[in-house]
């Protein structure tokens, strides 16, 4: 868990050792040089639960960075897509955004679906369909690109894209099905660990 400080003022607190945490520094920064400090705590509410089968280690295990965003922007995008080709896009935007457009692009760069709408209370929900989609599976992980563009009254303020797949995951009569086909999952209990750097693992460590 961590507290974030900027120029001697506390910005926020996060208590989760395995997920990212984001903090809005806007009202704490000033022109020129700023001091950003992270206060790391050794223990948290979940320490004893997390230590059932791996080492107790504390500290920052992944990257820390500062970035800027436009005042009017896309806050979040979520897409759900099933094997029938139907998809739903949920986009959250700031209040200055007046229009949201979404395009679905296939692997050949062709636009196979398009929708647009004006946000209501900072949110847009768009539904569409892609005819005969290439389905995602572990064996053939076919992906499409969702491009989301937000505009104010005149100009595009931000555009982002994410990759996604059409698939349906369900459990019927105790059997896990992906796109209607039974799937058997085998796994191993593995924790990210480097003998010298602890929880700080490189891409090479992950591949190995």
Regions found by a protein language model. Name each.
Residues 80-85:
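Short, solvent-exposed loop/linker segments at the N-terminal edge
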Residues 1-76, 96:
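Accessory beta-strand-rich segments of carbohydrate-active enzymes
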Residues 86-118, 124-126:
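Beta-strand-rich binding/interaction modules
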Residues 60, 112-113, 157-161:
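Extracellular and select intracellular beta-sandwich modules with Ser/Thr-enriched
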Residues 29-33, 130-143:
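Short glycine/proline/serine/threonine-rich loop/turn segments at secondary-structure transition edges
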Residues 40, 148-150:
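Conserved structural position at the C-terminal beta-strand
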